[in-house]
A protein has these predicted regions:
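A short beta-strand-loop structural module common to alpha/beta enzyme folds
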Residues: 48-62
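Helix-loop-strand module that forms the ligand-binding subsite of alpha/beta enzymes
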Residues: 66-150
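C-terminal and late-domain segments of enzyme folds
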Residues: 2-3, 7, 152
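Generic recognition of short, well-ordered alpha-helical segments
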Residues: 34-38, 63, 91-95
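Hydrophobic/aromatic beta-strand patches that form the interior of the parallel beta-sheet core
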Residues: 22-24, 50-52, 79, 120-122
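Short, flexible hinge/linker loops that cap or flank conserved catalytic cores
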Residues: 14-15, 113
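N-terminal beta1-alpha1 ligand-phosphate binding loop
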Residues: 2, 16-49
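Short histidine/acidic/glycine/proline-rich micro-motifs that form metal-
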Residues: 28-30, 56-59, 139
Length: 152
């Protein structure tokens, strides 16, 4: 069950004109968020920024693929905002990748919808920076966990 209290509202008022920013927030527990919630609030309502609370919009995990592809197509920049959980993206964000970034649309034959777009990661961890060092708790520098995003 996902925390539905204190969920931010999506900003889907159509202010994401071609060349805008599409910020996708995927935090399953907003009440516990110290950073993601504030970052989402700061971006919400800014001109040219469309925001999506992924868990708030799709609590049943039934993603509207066509609507999401249209939002991505309208954006010049896609920002993924979420905590790192078990050294990876939260489950609903992964499902979003699998269902929205499809063969023939995002990649493969004629899959050029992402061409010319930028992707920024705005990810947070529950541990301090020094825990992401060789010999420390997480054993690796944080960048070692980023190749799956780079390949996507």
């Amino acid at each position: 069950m996902h925390d539905t209290s204190q969920r931010p509202s999506d900003d889907d008022k159509g202010n994401n004109k071609q060349g805008g920013i599409y910020l996708i927030a995927a935090h399953p527990h907003w009440r516990e968020s110290r950073v993601n919630r504030r970052m989402f609030a700061a971006a919400s309502g800014l001109p040219g920024v469309t925001t999506l609370d992924l868990y708030g919009r799709y609590p049943d995990y039934h993603i509207d693929v066509h609507a999401e592809q249209a939002r991505v197509e309208a954006a010049r920049l896609v920002v993924l905002l979420h905590p790192i959980q078990w050294y990876a993206t939260p489950p609903l964000q992964k499902l979003w990748f699998d269902e929205v970034l499809t063969w023939g649309w995002a990649y493969g034959t004629d899959g050029n919808a992402l061409r010319g777009k930028d992707l920024w990661l705005a990810v947070t961890t529950g541990g301090p920076q020094d825990s992401y060092q060789p010999g420390s708790y997480n054993r690796y520098v944080f960048d070692a966990f980023l190749p799956p995003y780079e390949q996507t």
